[in-house]
């Protein structure tokens, strides 16, 4: 049975990382596509491909294809056009791929009337300052993320994907009126952060005024997923 809501805009994206398609569909059939969008990442896309995406679209769900594209500009151009041909709602691309790659991604969407939202990945929520230092990045995490956000804005991406803790700093330096912010790593108080080092609660996400939040394991691994979703929605 679908959940009822007065929400006009989808602002919750549920991350599907199932290895079993039947288990995924059992979970999905309880969701209302007018409330929730679905995120398909590397696991499910590799296992079930475009066929699975089309099944979800027929059910009315908007799809965020989270493959975090990162390649040379020419390859990205073709990949993003392929995504657009699938009527995908949102797609992710690594900002660190560079200005030319990002411009190529934007140019690839020019012929399309219904363009997917092009969202730039800043850094993975599993990384912290120590990890970045080992990669040779010596400036602070906040400065690095802000630098990437500015590049994404300059290249006319539709928005960025970043930790909630960085949003206030980004909003001080970038006009985010038409620039979407998506925050992953959402956890309820008391829940394990698993492998994510930069997590945000639903209440904080509301305070940060983000446009979209990604909910994953705290729901899909819950003994009562619908009750957990209702709790999250009550906090935003």
Curated annotation (Swiss-Prot):
Q: What InterPro entries has UniProt attached to this entry?
A: Aldolase_TIM, OMPdecase, OMPdecase_AS, OMPdecase_bac, OMPdeCOase_dom, RibuloseP-bd_barrel
**Catalytic center residues:** 68
Record GO terms (molecular function)? orotidine-5'-phosphate decarboxylase activity
This protein's name: Orotidine 5'-phosphate decarboxylase
Gene (UniProt): pyrF
EC class of this enzyme? lyase
Q: Which reaction does it catalyse?
A: orotidine 5'-phosphate + H(+) = UMP + CO2
Residues annotated as binding substrate: 17, 39, 66-75, 125, 187, 196, 216-217
State the species of origin: Buchnera aphidicola subsp. Baizongia pistaciae (strain Bp)
Similarity comment: Belongs to the OMP decarboxylase family. Type 1 subfamily.
Q: What does this protein do?
A: Catalyzes the decarboxylation of orotidine 5'-monophosphate (OMP) to uridine 5'-monophosphate (UMP).
Keywords, sorted A to Z = Decarboxylase, Lyase, Pyrimidine biosynthesis
| Domain of life of the native organism | Bacteria
One CC-aspect GO term: cytosol
């Amino acid at each position: 049975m679908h959940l009822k809501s007065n929400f006009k805009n989808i602002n919750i994206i549920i991350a599907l990382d199932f290895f079993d398609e039947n288990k995924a569909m059992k979970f999905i059939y309880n969701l209302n596509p007018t409330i929730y969008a679905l995120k398909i990442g590397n696991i499910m896309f590799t296992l079930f491909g475009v066929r699975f995406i089309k099944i979800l679209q027929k059910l009315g769900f908007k799809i965020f294809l989270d493959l975090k594209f990162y390649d040379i500009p020419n390859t990205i151009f073709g990949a993003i056009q392929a995504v657009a041909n699938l009527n995908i709602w949102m797609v992710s691309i690594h900002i660190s791929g560079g200005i030319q790659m990002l411009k190529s991604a934007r140019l690839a969407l020019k012929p399309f009337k219904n363009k997917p939202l092009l969202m730039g990945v800043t850094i993975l929520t599993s990384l912290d300052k120590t990890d970045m230092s080992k990669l040779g990045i010596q400036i602070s995490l906040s400065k690095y993320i802000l630098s990437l956000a500015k590049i994404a804005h300059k290249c006319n991406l539709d928005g960025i994907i970043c930790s909630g803790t960085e949003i206030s700093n980004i909003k001080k330096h970038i006009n985010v009126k038409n620039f979407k912010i998506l925050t992953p790593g959402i956890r309820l108080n008391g829940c394990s952060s698993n492998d994510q080092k930069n997590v945000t609660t639903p209440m904080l996400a509301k305070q940060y005024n983000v446009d979209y939040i990604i909910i994953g394991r705290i729901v899909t691994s819950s003994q009562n997923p619908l009750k957990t979703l209702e709790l999250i929605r009550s906090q935003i």
